[in-house]
């Protein structure tokens, strides 16, 4: 009998986890890919550095989040408005939310009304907000040096800085 309750509890937990999908634009914004970023994740007092690469893959975008040694932490494909696991890494809802929030931050001002139609967002010089539900919102702050500060949760923020790849050359 307790096995049934455990199965019901796990099913309910799965439904709750799947119910909140990150807000995504329809269709994807016009961005020049690939993009590479240095990411600093601030979770309370802890700060973690990582690298994020966004690249075109067929008709979708591959998001690869790597630790400083280049080990993948999350890999997701965004295609047809849906996230899909890419490779052997399991789906990571926190990574998906970060990727979706960064996509909102990177969307050009001129495309916001079209791509986020029907969503509760506002934009002002140096700042942008997207309300997710009655109790949460993504806050975006733009620094003059090109850095982006994303606040995606009560104690979870990201500092995102574009990496300059103009001097890189192919082997």
Question: For each predicted feature, which ranges?
Answer:
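Bacterial N-terminal signal peptides that target proteins for export
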Residues: 1-8
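C-terminal motif of bacterial Sec signal peptides marking the signal peptidase cleavage site
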Residues: 14-17
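Mature, soluble, non-transmembrane domains
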Residues: 19-21, 37-40, 45, 50-53, ...
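Short, low-complexity, disordered segments immediately C-terminal to signal peptides
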Residues: 23-33
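N-terminal, post-signal-peptide region of Sec/Tat-exported proteins
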Residues: 52-74
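Short acidic-glycine loop/turn motifs at beta-strand connectors
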Residues: 57, 78-82
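Hydrophobic beta-strand positions
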Residues: 65, 76-77, 129-131
